[in-house]
Protein backbone atom coordinates (compact mmCIF):
# COMPACT_ATOMS: atom_id res chain seq x y z
CA UNK A 1 0.00 0.00 0.00
CA UNK A 2 2.06 2.88 -1.30
CA UNK A 3 0.05 5.92 -0.26
CA UNK A 4 0.28 7.83 2.99
CA UNK A 5 -3.51 8.16 3.27
CA UNK A 6 -3.77 4.41 3.78
CA UNK A 7 -4.39 4.86 7.51
CA UNK A 8 -5.82 8.40 7.64
CA UNK A 9 -9.31 7.12 8.47
CA UNK A 10 -8.89 4.92 11.54
CA UNK A 11 -12.17 3.02 11.13
CA UNK A 12 -11.33 2.12 7.52
CA UNK A 13 -7.83 1.05 8.48
CA UNK A 14 -9.07 -1.33 11.18
CA UNK A 15 -11.95 -2.61 9.03
CA UNK A 16 -9.54 -3.40 6.20
CA UNK A 17 -7.28 -5.37 8.54
CA UNK A 18 -10.25 -7.37 9.84
CA UNK A 19 -11.50 -7.97 6.29
CA UNK A 20 -8.09 -9.31 5.28
CA UNK A 21 -8.26 -11.83 8.12
CA UNK A 22 -11.88 -12.75 7.37
CA UNK A 23 -10.98 -13.43 3.75
CA UNK A 24 -8.16 -15.73 4.84
CA UNK A 25 -5.53 -13.47 3.30
CA UNK A 26 -3.55 -12.85 6.48
CA UNK A 27 -0.96 -15.43 5.37
CA UNK A 28 0.23 -12.85 2.85
CA UNK A 29 2.66 -10.09 3.82
CA UNK A 30 1.72 -6.43 3.56
CA UNK A 31 3.79 -3.28 3.60
CA UNK A 32 2.19 0.13 3.99
CA UNK A 33 3.10 3.80 3.87
CA UNK A 34 1.42 5.34 6.91
CA UNK A 35 1.03 8.69 8.60
CA UNK A 36 2.24 7.98 12.12
CA UNK A 37 0.20 10.81 13.64
CA UNK A 38 -3.03 9.00 12.62
CA UNK A 39 -2.04 5.64 14.10
CA UNK A 40 -2.69 4.20 17.53
CA UNK A 41 -1.82 0.92 19.25
CA UNK A 42 -5.11 -0.79 18.42
CA UNK A 43 -4.73 -0.04 14.71
CA UNK A 44 -1.16 -1.33 14.69
CA UNK A 45 -2.20 -4.54 16.47
CA UNK A 46 -4.98 -5.12 13.94
CA UNK A 47 -2.60 -4.48 11.06
CA UNK A 48 0.02 -6.84 12.47
CA UNK A 49 -2.50 -9.64 12.92
CA UNK A 50 -3.61 -9.15 9.31
CA UNK A 51 -0.11 -9.77 7.95
CA UNK A 52 1.38 -6.28 7.85
CA UNK A 53 5.10 -6.71 8.45
CA UNK A 54 6.61 -3.34 7.48
CA UNK A 55 5.44 0.23 8.01
CA UNK A 56 6.91 3.21 6.17
CA UNK A 57 6.73 6.44 8.13
CA UNK A 58 7.24 9.91 6.67
CA UNK A 59 9.38 11.30 9.49
CA UNK A 60 10.57 14.21 7.33
CA UNK A 61 12.40 16.25 9.98
CA UNK A 62 13.52 16.35 13.58
CA UNK A 63 13.13 20.13 13.68
CA UNK A 64 9.95 21.85 14.85
CA UNK A 65 10.99 24.98 12.95
CA UNK A 66 11.41 23.15 9.64
CA UNK A 67 8.15 21.25 10.20
CA UNK A 68 6.33 24.56 10.62
CA UNK A 69 7.80 25.96 7.40
CA UNK A 70 6.90 22.72 5.60
CA UNK A 71 3.32 23.15 6.93
CA UNK A 72 3.31 19.63 8.35
CA UNK A 73 0.93 20.66 11.11
CA UNK A 74 -0.32 17.73 13.20
CA UNK A 75 1.65 15.31 11.03
CA UNK A 76 4.76 16.40 12.95
CA UNK A 77 4.75 15.04 16.49
CA UNK A 78 8.06 13.52 17.55
CA UNK A 79 6.71 12.13 20.82
CA UNK A 80 3.95 10.33 18.90
CA UNK A 81 6.53 9.13 16.37
CA UNK A 82 8.69 7.57 19.07
CA UNK A 83 5.65 5.98 20.71
CA UNK A 84 4.34 4.40 17.50
CA UNK A 85 7.74 3.20 16.34
CA UNK A 86 8.54 1.64 19.71
CA UNK A 87 5.16 -0.10 19.85
CA UNK A 88 5.45 -1.29 16.26
CA UNK A 89 8.83 -2.84 17.01
CA UNK A 90 7.36 -4.58 20.07
CA UNK A 91 4.92 -6.28 17.68
CA UNK A 92 7.80 -7.48 15.51
CA UNK A 93 7.21 -5.02 12.69
CA UNK A 94 9.93 -3.49 10.53
CA UNK A 95 10.12 0.29 10.41
CA UNK A 96 11.19 2.23 7.34
CA UNK A 97 11.68 5.97 7.82
CA UNK A 98 11.87 8.72 5.22
CA UNK A 99 13.50 12.06 6.02
CA UNK A 100 14.46 15.15 4.05
CA UNK A 101 17.29 17.64 4.34
CA UNK A 102 17.49 21.25 3.18
CA UNK A 103 13.81 22.23 3.17
CA UNK A 104 12.27 25.61 3.90
CA UNK A 105 13.31 26.87 7.31
CA UNK A 106 16.32 24.59 7.40
CA UNK A 107 19.84 25.47 8.45
CA UNK A 108 22.87 23.49 9.45
CA UNK A 109 21.70 23.60 13.08
CA UNK A 110 18.08 22.64 12.32
CA UNK A 111 19.03 19.77 10.01
CA UNK A 112 21.43 18.52 12.68
CA UNK A 113 18.33 17.85 14.79
CA UNK A 114 17.16 15.48 12.05
CA UNK A 115 20.58 13.82 11.95
CA UNK A 116 20.44 13.36 15.73
CA UNK A 117 16.93 11.88 15.50
CA UNK A 118 18.09 9.35 12.91
CA UNK A 119 20.97 8.26 15.15
CA UNK A 120 18.73 8.03 18.21
CA UNK A 121 16.19 5.78 16.50
CA UNK A 122 18.75 3.59 14.75
CA UNK A 123 20.87 3.14 17.88
CA UNK A 124 17.81 1.94 19.80
CA UNK A 125 17.03 -0.62 17.11
CA UNK A 126 13.84 1.19 16.13
CA UNK A 127 14.76 2.02 12.55
CA UNK A 128 15.39 -0.84 10.13
CA UNK A 129 15.66 1.10 6.88
CA UNK A 130 15.94 4.72 5.90
CA UNK A 131 15.47 6.94 2.88
CA UNK A 132 17.26 10.28 3.00
CA UNK A 133 16.30 12.86 0.39
CA UNK A 134 17.34 16.42 -0.30
CA UNK A 135 14.21 18.56 -0.16
CA UNK A 136 13.79 19.59 -3.78
CA UNK A 137 11.26 22.15 -5.09
CA UNK A 138 9.11 20.71 -7.86
CA UNK A 139 7.56 23.07 -10.45
CA UNK A 140 4.03 24.08 -9.54
CA UNK A 141 4.57 23.86 -5.79
CA UNK A 142 4.69 26.75 -3.33
CA UNK A 143 8.25 25.71 -2.46
CA UNK A 144 9.35 26.06 -6.09
CA UNK A 145 7.58 29.39 -6.60
CA UNK A 146 9.10 30.75 -3.41
CA UNK A 147 12.58 29.69 -4.52
CA UNK A 148 12.11 31.35 -7.92
CA UNK A 149 10.89 34.60 -6.34
CA UNK A 150 13.88 34.70 -3.98
CA UNK A 151 16.42 33.61 -6.65
CA UNK A 152 17.41 30.56 -4.61
CA UNK A 153 17.68 28.13 -7.53
CA UNK A 154 21.05 27.59 -9.13
CA UNK A 155 20.94 28.82 -12.76
CA UNK A 156 23.30 26.02 -13.79
CA UNK A 157 21.03 23.25 -12.49
CA UNK A 158 19.35 21.06 -15.09
CA UNK A 159 16.14 19.14 -14.53
CA UNK A 160 17.97 15.87 -13.89
CA UNK A 161 19.11 17.38 -10.60
CA UNK A 162 15.54 17.68 -9.30
CA UNK A 163 15.31 14.09 -8.06
CA UNK A 164 16.27 14.74 -4.42
CA UNK A 165 18.81 11.95 -4.59
CA UNK A 166 22.00 13.64 -3.49
CA UNK A 167 21.92 16.72 -5.71
CA UNK A 168 21.23 20.17 -4.26
CA UNK A 169 19.38 22.71 -6.39
CA UNK A 170 18.53 25.28 -3.70
CA UNK A 171 21.14 27.72 -2.39
CA UNK A 172 20.13 29.58 0.76
CA UNK A 173 22.31 32.57 1.72
CA UNK A 174 22.70 31.17 5.24
CA UNK A 175 22.88 27.52 4.19
CA UNK A 176 24.83 26.97 0.95
CA UNK A 177 24.53 23.86 -1.19
CA UNK A 178 27.81 22.45 0.10
CA UNK A 179 26.54 22.48 3.68
CA UNK A 180 23.22 20.91 2.66
CA UNK A 181 25.16 18.17 0.91
CA UNK A 182 27.22 17.68 4.07
CA UNK A 183 24.06 17.36 6.20
CA UNK A 184 22.70 14.81 3.72
CA UNK A 185 25.81 12.67 4.14
CA UNK A 186 25.71 13.10 7.92
CA UNK A 187 22.16 11.73 8.01
CA UNK A 188 23.22 8.62 6.09
CA UNK A 189 26.25 8.20 8.36
CA UNK A 190 24.09 8.66 11.46
CA UNK A 191 21.96 5.70 10.38
CA UNK A 192 25.06 3.56 9.91
CA UNK A 193 26.53 4.60 13.26
CA UNK A 194 23.25 3.92 15.00
CA UNK A 195 22.93 0.48 13.42
CA UNK A 196 26.50 -0.27 14.44
CA UNK A 197 25.73 0.59 18.06
CA UNK A 198 22.57 -1.51 18.16
CA UNK A 199 23.82 -4.52 16.21
CA UNK A 200 27.61 -4.79 16.63
CA UNK A 201 27.39 -7.18 19.59
CA UNK A 202 25.18 -9.69 17.80
CA UNK A 203 27.13 -9.30 14.57
CA UNK A 204 30.45 -10.05 16.31
CA UNK A 205 29.03 -13.14 18.04
CA UNK A 206 27.73 -14.53 14.75
CA UNK A 207 31.00 -13.67 13.01
CA UNK A 208 33.13 -15.51 15.58
CA UNK A 209 30.95 -18.60 15.25
CA UNK A 210 31.17 -18.57 11.46
CA UNK A 211 34.92 -17.94 11.36
CA UNK A 212 35.71 -21.07 13.38
CA UNK A 213 35.55 -22.92 10.06
CA UNK A 214 38.49 -20.93 8.66
CA UNK A 215 41.87 -22.36 9.77
CA UNK A 216 44.60 -20.04 10.98
CA UNK A 217 46.98 -19.06 8.20
CA UNK A 218 44.43 -19.53 5.40
CA UNK A 219 44.49 -17.05 2.53
CA UNK A 220 41.19 -15.17 2.65
CA UNK A 221 39.56 -12.65 0.32
CA UNK A 222 36.69 -10.61 1.78
CA UNK A 223 34.14 -9.00 -0.51
CA UNK A 224 32.98 -5.59 0.64
CA UNK A 225 29.31 -6.55 0.27
CA UNK A 226 28.14 -5.00 3.56
CA UNK A 227 28.54 -1.66 5.31
CA UNK A 228 32.05 -0.60 6.33
CA UNK A 229 31.34 -0.96 10.05
CA UNK A 230 30.55 -4.62 9.44
CA UNK A 231 33.79 -5.06 7.50
CA UNK A 232 35.72 -3.57 10.44
CA UNK A 233 34.08 -6.06 12.82
CA UNK A 234 34.93 -8.91 10.46
CA UNK A 235 38.60 -7.91 10.56
CA UNK A 236 38.50 -7.69 14.36
CA UNK A 237 37.04 -11.19 14.73
CA UNK A 238 39.08 -13.07 12.13
CA UNK A 239 42.31 -14.79 13.18
CA UNK A 240 43.73 -14.24 9.72
CA UNK A 241 45.00 -11.26 7.81
CA UNK A 242 42.87 -10.83 4.70
CA UNK A 243 42.65 -9.08 1.35
CA UNK A 244 39.59 -7.04 0.41
CA UNK A 245 37.74 -6.58 -2.87
CA UNK A 246 35.65 -3.42 -2.91
CA UNK A 247 34.72 -0.09 -4.39
CA UNK A 248 37.07 2.91 -4.60
CA UNK A 249 35.05 4.95 -2.10
CA UNK A 250 35.02 2.18 0.52
CA UNK A 251 38.72 1.46 0.03
CA UNK A 252 39.62 4.97 1.17
CA UNK A 253 37.70 4.46 4.42
CA UNK A 254 39.12 1.01 5.19
CA UNK A 255 42.78 1.23 4.17
CA UNK A 256 45.27 0.92 6.99
CA UNK A 257 43.04 -1.20 9.24
CA UNK A 258 44.70 -3.90 11.33
CA UNK A 259 44.33 -7.32 9.74
CA UNK A 260 44.01 -5.96 6.20
CA UNK A 261 46.84 -6.84 3.80
CA UNK A 262 45.79 -5.25 0.53
CA UNK A 263 42.70 -3.79 -1.09
CA UNK A 264 41.69 -4.71 -4.63
CA UNK A 265 39.58 -1.79 -5.81
CA UNK A 266 37.43 -2.20 -8.92
CA UNK A 267 35.85 1.24 -9.26
CA UNK A 268 32.21 1.77 -8.36
CA UNK A 269 28.84 0.03 -8.44
CA UNK A 270 27.62 -3.37 -7.32
CA UNK A 271 29.59 -6.59 -7.66
CA UNK A 272 29.15 -8.08 -11.13
CA UNK A 273 31.24 -9.62 -13.88
CA UNK A 274 30.83 -6.41 -15.85
CA UNK A 275 32.05 -4.07 -13.10
CA UNK A 276 35.36 -5.88 -12.48
CA UNK A 277 38.04 -5.68 -15.17
CA UNK A 278 39.46 -8.84 -16.74
CA UNK A 279 42.94 -7.85 -15.52
CA UNK A 280 41.73 -7.66 -11.91
CA UNK A 281 39.87 -10.97 -12.22
CA UNK A 282 43.05 -12.62 -13.49
CA UNK A 283 45.05 -11.08 -10.65
CA UNK A 284 42.59 -12.43 -8.08
CA UNK A 285 42.78 -15.90 -9.62
CA UNK A 286 46.56 -15.86 -9.37
CA UNK A 287 46.33 -15.08 -5.64
CA UNK A 288 44.90 -18.60 -5.12
CA UNK A 289 42.78 -17.80 -2.09
CA UNK A 290 41.69 -20.64 0.20
CA UNK A 291 38.46 -18.88 1.16
CA UNK A 292 36.35 -16.11 -0.33
CA UNK A 293 34.21 -14.54 2.37
CA UNK A 294 30.97 -12.93 1.16
CA UNK A 295 29.35 -11.14 4.13
CA UNK A 296 25.55 -10.94 4.00
CA UNK A 297 23.76 -8.47 6.25
CA UNK A 298 20.28 -9.79 5.57
CA UNK A 299 20.59 -13.57 5.48
CA UNK A 300 17.01 -14.02 6.72
CA UNK A 301 15.65 -11.77 3.92
CA UNK A 302 14.11 -9.42 6.46
CA UNK A 303 12.06 -6.80 4.70
CA UNK A 304 11.32 -8.97 1.69
CA UNK A 305 8.62 -11.26 3.09
CA UNK A 306 6.26 -10.07 0.37
CA UNK A 307 8.49 -11.30 -2.48
What would you call each of these model-derived segments?
Residues 89, 93-98, 108, 121-124:
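Conserved beta-strand->loop/alpha-helix structural units within folded catalytic cores of enzymes
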Residues 1-96, 103:
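Conserved SAM/AdoMet-binding glycine-rich loop
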Residues 210-220:
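A short, charged/proline- and glycine-enriched loop
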Residues 46-55, 112-134, 257-269:
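Structural recognition of alpha->loop->beta junctions
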Residues 31, 56, 96-98, 131, ...:
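A structural signal for isolated positions on well-ordered beta-strands in alpha/beta enzyme cores
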Residues 219-307:
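Active-site and donor-binding regions of nucleotide-sugar-utilizing enzymes
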Residues 109-210:
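C-terminal accessory regions of radical SAM enzymes
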Residues 2, 58, 133, 266, ...:
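Conserved residues at the C-terminal ends of beta-strands
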Amino acid sequence: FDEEVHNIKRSFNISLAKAIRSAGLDHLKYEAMCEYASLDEEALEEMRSAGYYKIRFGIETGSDKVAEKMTLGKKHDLDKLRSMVKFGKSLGMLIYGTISIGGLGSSREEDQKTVDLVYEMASKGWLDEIQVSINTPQPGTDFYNSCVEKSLLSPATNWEGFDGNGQVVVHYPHYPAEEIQSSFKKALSAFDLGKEKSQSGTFSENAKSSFNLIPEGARVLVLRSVRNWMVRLILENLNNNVDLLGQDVSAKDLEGLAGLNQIHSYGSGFFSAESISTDLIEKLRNEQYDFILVPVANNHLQGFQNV
